Amino acid sequence: MKTYSAKPAEVQRDWYLVDATDKTLGRLASEVAHRLRGKHKPVFTPHVDAGDYIVVINADKIRLTGRKERDKQYFWHTGFPGGIKSRSVAEVRERHPERLIESAVRGMMPKNRLGRAMLKKLKVYAGNEHRHHAQQPQPLEL
């Protein structure tokens, strides 16, 4: 008996809809990353993208515990000397609320080419509307 290894052409991908209203950021992100990677499937193979598509709505209503809204900072560098920049969670939520979930999930994915390909299957929207009705995403309760 041989160990089964999934092939990219044989992978069955589904679409799921997740409502982020009043969900904790880290707990939601870990479950989304798990499903994007395909680890919930019996045909999971580490070198094959076997994950599903995930559409997250109401990203602006995500919940954070403790004082993270005020204390947590997101850092980046412009590439110029002294170009370190930062924004608090409150500022990021005000400008681009979907980036909170995208950033949390990105940190939980593999840091390689396959991880970047898996992240393209994550669609995050700040409001209640999304553009993927034609794919008929199934509601997923996390």
From Swiss-Prot:
Gene3D superfamilies: Ribosomal protein L13
GO MF term list: mRNA binding; structural constituent of ribosome
Keywords for the protein's UniProt record, in alphabetical order: Ribonucleoprotein, Ribosomal protein
Protein name: Large ribosomal subunit protein uL13
GO annotation, cellular component aspect: cytosolic large ribosomal subunit
Binding partners and assembly: Part of the 50S ribosomal subunit.
Lineage: superkingdom: Bacteria
The encoding gene: rplM
UniProt cross-references to PANTHER family, sorted A to Z: LARGE RIBOSOMAL SUBUNIT PROTEIN UL13M, RIBOSOMAL PROTEIN L13
